[in-house]
A protein has these predicted regions:
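Condensing-enzyme catalytic core of the thiolase-fold
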Residues: 1-186, 191, 202, 207, ...
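Short hydrophobic/aromatic beta-strand micro-patches
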Residues: 196
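Charge-dense polyanion-binding interfaces
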Residues: 219-229
Length: 229
């Protein structure tokens, strides 16, 4: 998987030490999307912090709605690994990341178990989100251009929040293999190699050793070694 962007912020002053700030959470998500340079509608799964608390979860949903600014007609599954393995405290963020990376690798959405009975204050019917309750193929979102569907890569947003108001959000994307490009070199072209060293003395020594190696090994042929350099 590829990390497209990540951001952190803090909720600032709230009604209590453990009370989240939906405005700060929404601003964080918007900033992470901006840094990733991807549209909100391209996110086809959200891994929520989702501690299962009566107050925190509705506030997080409010922050997600603020951050993604979806139309209500757009649907995006959400889940939380905490419903499956519990709250790992300091390791909860990396657990969420590992979960989503494995989902991207296998192109599957996995259920958040023990979540059949939802907090009534979530009001998910008034949002573009729904809880992922079953194991199924991960279908990416798409955009319509002159009636034609163009699918986005599978992308996910991952939230992880601290008890004292610290917030983090990461956007990751599935890895797509790129076709290998056969690069051919010849002696008629010039190529620029970049070298660095601690100081000029070491730089000149390094350049001299490299030049000797090139003359011995490459002769007049440019090959894979040239690409490495």
């Amino acid at each position: 998987a590829k990390v497209l962007s990540s951001s952190i912020n803090h909720g600032g002053k709230t009604n209590g030490y453990t009370v989240p700030n939906p405005v700060a959470q929404g601003a964080l998500i918007s900033e992470t999307l901006r840094k990733a340079k991807v549209p909100a509608e391209s996110i086809s799964y959200v891994e929520a912090h989702g501690t299962g608390t009566a107050l925190g979860d509705p506030i997080e949903i409010s922050g997600l709605v603020r951050g993604f600014k979806y139309n209500v007609t757009e649907i995006c599954p959400i889940g939380s690994v905490k419903s499956n393995i519990g709250h790992l405290e300091a390791a909860s963020g990396i657990a969420a990341l590992i979960k989503v990376v494995l989902m991207l690798k296998n192109k599957k959405l996995v259920p958040s178990i023990h979540s059949e009975t939802l907090n009534e204050n979530l009001n998910l019917s008034e949002t573009p989100f729904y809880i992922q309750h079953k194991y199924e193929d991960w279908i990416p979102t798409y955009k319509l251009t002159e009636g034609r569907k163009t699918y986005y890569p599978r992308r996910a947003g991952i939230s992880s929040f601290g008890a004292g108001g610290s917030n983090s959000h990461v956007i990751i994307e599935e890895y797509s293999e790129q076709p290998e490009v056969d690069i051919k070199f010849d002696s008629e072209h010039e190529f620029a190699f970049v070298f660095s060293a601690e100081n000029k003395e070491y730089l000149y020594k390094y350049l001299n050793k490299t030049l000797i190696w090139i003359n011995k090994q490459l002769k007049d042929t440019y090959n894979e070694e040239t690409i490495v350099l």
